[in-house]
Amino acid sequence: MSSHPQTFYQLTGRGHAPANLSNATLLVIDAQEEYRSGVVQLPGLDAAQVEIAKLLDAVRAQGGAIVHIKHLGIPGGLLDPRGPRGAHLPEVAPLPGEIVVEKRMPNAFSGTELHEKLQSLGHLD
């Protein structure tokens, strides 16, 4: 087993050039406090958060676009949009000017403006 995550291209033995970050859009999906301190805590979240932060730094440095996807859960329940567990993880939270798309379904395209936002950015990678 590999000591670091691999892409689908690597897992299938295909090569692929790295994305051009200045022409890329990074999607950060559901990086929310519920997964660190709520009832659906994820193992390995701290390590994942470090990697997300590295990606954010790299894309920001190259002027790429960033879209944060935030799940709006049930008031008083999972991913409570009014409570602290529904908040973005502060270490990887959106900066002013970065796009935030709020979703209520597991599919970030369902009932959101994600498709339109991505199309308007016009990025290829």
List the predicted regions and their residue ranges:
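Internal catalytic-core helix/loop-beta-alpha segment
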Residues: P94-D125
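Active-site acidic carboxylates
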Residues: M1-V100
